[in-house]
């Protein structure tokens, strides 16, 4: 298990709707804990495969 993630390595992450991009620290998971980051957003992806509209993610601006 990734110490930065509540899920088992390779499994889907689960995160509350209030999750912020900066809290997305999963490195061993295939899916993101956060849905506010677009794919390829290096600032908040931090190893996660983030998805969503970039206009919903102020840390990517």
Curated annotation (Swiss-Prot):
Binding site for a divalent metal cation 5: 34, 36-37, 50
Region described as Beta: spans on this chain: 1-29
Keyword Phosphoprotein (UniProt): no
UniProt-listed SUPFAM superfamilies: Metallothionein (SSF57868)
Amino-acid positions noted as binding a divalent metal cation 2 in the UniProt annotation, renumbered to this chain: 7, 13, 15, 26
Gene Ontology cellular-component annotations: cytoplasm; nucleus
Entry domain remark: Class I metallothioneins contain 2 metal-binding domains: four divalent ions are chelated within cluster A of the alpha domain and are coordinated via cysteinyl thiolate bridges to 11 cysteine ligands. Cluster B, the corresponding region within the beta domain, can ligate three divalent ions to 9 cysteines.
Organism (species): Macaca fascicularis
Binding, a divalent metal cation 6: 37, 41, 44, 60
GO biological process, one term: detoxification of copper ion
GO molecular function terms attached to this record: zinc ion binding
Record Gene3D superfamilies: Metallothionein Isoform II
Region (Antigenic epitope): 20-25
Record: residues binding a divalent metal cation 7: 50, 57, 59-60
Protein known as: Metallothionein-2
Segments of this protein annotated with the region Alpha: 30-61
Role of this protein: Metallothioneins have a high content of cysteine residues that bind various heavy metals; these proteins are transcriptionally regulated by both heavy metals and glucocorticoids.
Xref: InterPro entries: Metalthion_dom_sf, Metalthion_dom_sf_vert, Metalthion_vert, Metalthion_vert_metal_BS
N-acetylmethionine carried by residues: 1
Binding locations of a divalent metal cation 3: 15, 19, 24, 29
TM stretches of this protein: none
Entry similarity comment: Belongs to the metallothionein superfamily. Type 1 family.
Chain residues that bind a divalent metal cation 4: 33-34, 44, 48
Keyword Metal-binding: yes
Miscellaneous comment in the UniProt entry for this protein: This metallothionein binds zinc.
Record key words, sorted: Acetylation, Cadmium, Metal-binding, Metal-thiolate cluster, Zinc
